[in-house]
Amino acid sequence: MSDFENLSGNDKELQEFLLIEKQKAQVNAQIHEFNEICWEKCIGKPSTKLDHATETCLSNCVDRFIDTSLLITQRFAQMLQKRGGGDL
């Protein structure tokens, strides 16, 4: 019976590891999405150097997406907490 309990503990560790790896993959995918969207929005034609306006556009673009993503994540967490508490 102790082998079964250890297996269950190992399964939990594996699940946590997989969850962390999935979150890392999601962050990487989001970064690539930001890059693509902001590149299309801010870069008219590639050159050897970014001008100030382009740098500002890229920075603002990424900041907007990060702020929006954080807001959505926070709201989703709040909804889950309410649901867990039986309020939803």
Curated annotation (Swiss-Prot):
<keyword id="KW-0653">Protein transport</keyword>
<comment type="function">
    <text>Mitochondrial intermembrane chaperone that participates in the import and insertion of some multi-pass transmembrane proteins into the mitochondrial inner membrane. Also required for the transfer of beta-barrel precursors from the TOM complex to the sorting and assembly machinery (SAM complex) of the outer membrane. Acts as a chaperone-like protein that protects the hydrophobic precursors from aggregation and guide them through the mitochondrial intermembrane space.</text>
</comment>
<dbReference type="Pfam" id="PF02953">
    <property type="entry name" value="zf-Tim10_DDP"/>
</dbReference>
<protein>
    <recommendedName>
        <fullName>Mitochondrial import inner membrane translocase subunit Tim8</fullName>
    </recommendedName>
</protein>
<dbReference type="GO" id="GO:0005743">
    <property type="term" value="C:mitochondrial inner membrane"/>
</dbReference>
<feature type="disulfide bond">
    <location>
        <begin position="38"/>
        <end position="61"/>
    </location>
</feature>
<dbReference type="InterPro" id="IPR004217">
    <property type="entry name" value="Tim10-like"/>
</dbReference>
<keyword id="KW-0496">Mitochondrion</keyword>
<keyword id="KW-0143">Chaperone</keyword>
<keyword id="KW-0479">Metal-binding</keyword>
<dbReference type="GO" id="GO:0005758">
    <property type="term" value="C:mitochondrial intermembrane space"/>
</dbReference>
<keyword id="KW-0999">Mitochondrion inner membrane</keyword>
<feature type="short sequence motif" description="Twin CX3C motif">
    <location>
        <begin position="38"/>
        <end position="61"/>
    </location>
</feature>
<comment type="subunit">
    <text>Heterohexamer; composed of 3 copies of Tim8 and 3 copies of Tim13, named soluble 70 kDa complex. Associates with the TIM22 complex, whose core is composed of Tim22.</text>
</comment>
<dbReference type="GO" id="GO:0046872">
    <property type="term" value="F:metal ion binding"/>
</dbReference>
<dbReference type="GO" id="GO:0140318">
    <property type="term" value="F:protein transporter activity"/>
</dbReference>
<dbReference type="GO" id="GO:0042719">
    <property type="term" value="C:mitochondrial intermembrane space protein transporter complex"/>
</dbReference>
<feature type="disulfide bond">
    <location>
        <begin position="42"/>
        <end position="57"/>
    </location>
</feature>
<dbReference type="InterPro" id="IPR035427">
    <property type="entry name" value="Tim10-like_dom_sf"/>
</dbReference>
<keyword id="KW-0811">Translocation</keyword>
<dbReference type="GO" id="GO:0005739">
    <property type="term" value="C:mitochondrion"/>
</dbReference>
<keyword id="KW-0813">Transport</keyword>
<keyword id="KW-0862">Zinc</keyword>
<keyword id="KW-1015">Disulfide bond</keyword>
<comment type="similarity">
    <text>Belongs to the small Tim family.</text>
</comment>
<dbReference type="GO" id="GO:0045039">
    <property type="term" value="P:protein insertion into mitochondrial inner membrane"/>
</dbReference>
<keyword id="KW-0472">Membrane</keyword>
